[in-house]
Design a protein with these regions (language model features):
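Well-ordered, non-membrane alpha-helical segments in soluble/globular domains
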Residues: 26-31, 115-118, 150-152
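Conserved catalytic network of the ASCE P-loop NTPase/AAA+ motor domain
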Residues: 38-39, 80-83, 124-128
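Walker A/P-loop-proximal flanking segment of P-loop NTPase domains
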Residues: 1-52, 58-65
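Charged C-terminal transducer/switch regions of large nucleotide-driven machines
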Residues: 86-99, 121-125
């Protein structure tokens, strides 16, 4: 029997039985990402209430980007001519973004070190012919932390 859960963790990925149901809204969001990217927008925000499928959307998007077969949301070639996609997945928490990024990237130092490491990973992916995408899920927690601790 298949179990339904309102929450998904993008770092844990999807199990073999992951079956994303593409709704018209999800298709609109995916099309908006592709159209926006192709017109020069490279950062996107997906918002919605708890349990509406934002994390599952990211998992389905990742699956499409890394799949050679059938695509549910987008055909990766409409986004880039790169043959491979690398996805850096971060789940937000009540911490500053630099700390979350340092932890995920397994580095020490300042926010500048984070930017240097991201630049390095981007360049390495590019050398491999890959397209680097960063997913930050639960970003609202990061914003809440910033508002309470360092609103400037």
């Amino acid at each position: 029997m298949q179990q339904f859960s309102l929450s998904a963790n993008i770092e844990e990925g999807q199990d073999k039985d992951f079956n994303y149901i593409v709704t018209p809204n999800a298709q609109d969001v995916a099309s908006g990402i592709v159209n926006g990217y192709n017109s020069g927008i490279h950062s996107f925000t997906i918002i919605g209430s708890y349990g509406t499928g934002k994390s599952c959307f990211l998992l389905a998007l990742e699956k499409d980007l890394q799949s050679k077969g059938q695509h549910n949301l987008i055909n990766p070639q409409t986004l880039s001519s790169c043959k491979k996609y690398e996805v850096l997945k971060i789940v937000g928490d009540y911490k500053d973004l630099a700390s979350l990024m340092r932890n995920k990237l397994a580095i020490d130092g300042t926010a500048d070190n984070v930017l240097d490491e991201l630049r390095n990973r981007y360049n390495q992916a590019k050398k491999r012919g890959s397209f680097l995408i960063i997913f930050i899920d639960e970003f609202g927690k990061v914003l809440e932390h910033a508002a309470k601790n360092d609103p400037e």
